[in-house]
Amino acid sequence: METVAHHRYAKSSSQKVRLVADLIRGCDASRAMEILNFSNKKAARLIKKILKSAISNAEHNEGENIENLKIKTIYVNPGPSIKRIMPRAKGRSDRILKRTSHITIVLSGKK
C-alpha cells in the first residue's frame, strides 16, 4: 500500500529542497523525522510538514503504523517562477525570479 502527500508551490527553489530530500530518500519514516528535526534548513521544515501529512494519511486511510512505513520515493520538481523587479542605478532595473517547487513524498509499508 502506498500513501502520497504533495506540497505544491512551496516557496523555495527546487535545488535547495533537493539537498534535504536526498538525505532522507529510502529511510524509514521515523528515522527521516529524526534527520529533519536536527536539520536547520528551511527546506527541512517544509519536507517535515509533508512527511507528517503522509504519515497521518497512512495511519488514517490505510491503518498503517509509523514503524512499518518507509519513504519509497521523494521528488522535487520546479514550479512556476514569480517575476519581480529590482530597481538599479540610472533608472535601470533587474528581473528577480522568486522560484517555487512542487514536493511529493510516497510512503510504502515494509513487508
UniProtKB/Swiss-Prot annotation:
CDD domains: Ribosomal_L22. GO terms for cellular component: cytosolic large ribosomal subunit. InterPro entries: Ribosomal_uL22 (IPR001063), Ribosomal_uL22_bac/chlpt-type (IPR005727), Ribosomal_uL22_bac/org-type (IPR047867), Ribosomal_uL22_CS (IPR018260), Ribosomal_uL22_sf (IPR036394). GO terms for molecular function: rRNA binding; structural constituent of ribosome. SUPFAM superfamilies: Ribosomal protein L22 (SSF54843). The keyword Transferase does not apply. It comes from the Bacteria. PROSITE patterns: RIBOSOMAL_L22. The keyword Protein biosynthesis does not apply. Keywords: Ribonucleoprotein, Ribosomal protein, RNA-binding, rRNA-binding. GO terms for biological process: translation. Belongs to the universal ribosomal protein uL22 family. This protein binds specifically to 23S rRNA; its binding is stimulated by other ribosomal proteins, e.g. L4, L17, and L20. It is important during the early stages of 50S assembly. It makes multiple contacts with different domains of the 23S rRNA in the assembled 50S subunit and ribosome. Part of the 50S ribosomal subunit. This is Large ribosomal subunit protein uL22. It comes from Wigglesworthia glossinidia brevipalpis. The gene is rplV.
